[in-house]
Amino acid sequence: MSEIFNALPGIEVEVGAIAKSLAHMWEATAASGRAAPASNDVRATQANVVLHLGFNTTPADALEQFQTMLRFSQRYPSRVVVLCPLKEEHGATEMRAKIYGECFLGRSKGDTRCVEFVMLSYPIAARQRLEDQVSICLSTDLPLYYWVHRFLTTQRMADYTYLLSRAKRVLIDSATAPADTLAYPWPNPAALRDLVYSRLLPVRQTVGQFLAGYSPEILVDGLKAVTVRHGGELAAEARVTLGWLQRRLAACGATVQDIAFADETDGNGKFEIHFAYGTAGKFFHWAGDLTTRHAMFEADFGSGPATLPAPVSLLAPEWALSEAMFF
C-alpha cells in the first residue's frame, strides 16, 4: 500500500506535526492569493470522513476515490482522513503522513467551501497507535462518517471497532466488498449504508413513481414472479433492486413467500424489471439503458396497456456518498 500512499496528492509531513502543518499550508495558500478558510468560518468544514483503503485498492482506484471526495466537498466541506494500511511483509514500522487542502468559492460572497485531507500510511503493527492519531486529525465537534473501501476480508474489521462504533454512518459498497460483508456483526447495524443502494436512487424513484399510479391491491393481486435482468457488471445493483422490490411489495400486502424472486444475467446491456401475473395479459416491464440513459415502461394492470419513456441513470459517486451519509 506504500504505492497508494505515494500516488495520492499532498505534502509529506511529520506525523506529530499534522495540525501545525495544516495551519501553515492554509497560511501559505492565503498569502499566495488563493482561496483559504477564514479562521473564524465555522462553515468551512462540516463533516469528518475517514476513507479506509483496503488491500484490494489499486493506486488508480485510490486516486478515483480521492477525486470523488474532492467533488463531494464542493457541496459538503469536509476533513478527510485517508487510511492506507501496509501489509505485514512490507517491513515498515512507522506511520507516514501527507496533507492536502483545497477551497472552492461558492455562489455568494464569503461562501468558501474547503476540504482538508490527511493521508496516513501505517503498518499493521502500528494499528494500536492509529486510534489516537485519527482522533487528533478529526474535528471533535463534527459528525464522523466511516467509508470502508475494498477490504480484502472482514476479519480485520474488529480491529477498527472504535471507528465503527463512533461513526454516524458506516459506508460500504457491496459490489466490491467481501462476500460476507452484509452478514458481518456490525456494532451499530442501523448506521450501515450500502453505496449500491444509494446510487440506485434514480431507478428506485422512477419505478416507484410509476407503480404509485396503481393501487397496492392491483399491484400484488395474482403476482407470481418478479425478475431483474442485468449485465454482469450490474450484479450487485440487481441484487439490491430485487431486495428493494421484495420489501416494497410486502408493504403493499403481497405474500412474498408465494412469489418467485430471481435475478438473471443477460448480455443485452440493459437493466430490466419484470412482474409476471397469473392473470392473462397482466404484466409490468421496465427496461433501462444506463449507457443512453433512456428507459421504457410497459404495463397492463387490467385497464389497458400503458407505455411511458423515461430517463434513467445511477447517481454519480459523490452524490451517492451524500445520499448514503445524510438520508
Mark where each language-model region is.
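A short acidic (Asp/Glu
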Residues: 62, 93, 130, 155-158, ...
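C-terminal structured domains
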Residues: 1-11, 21, 25-40, 45-47, ...
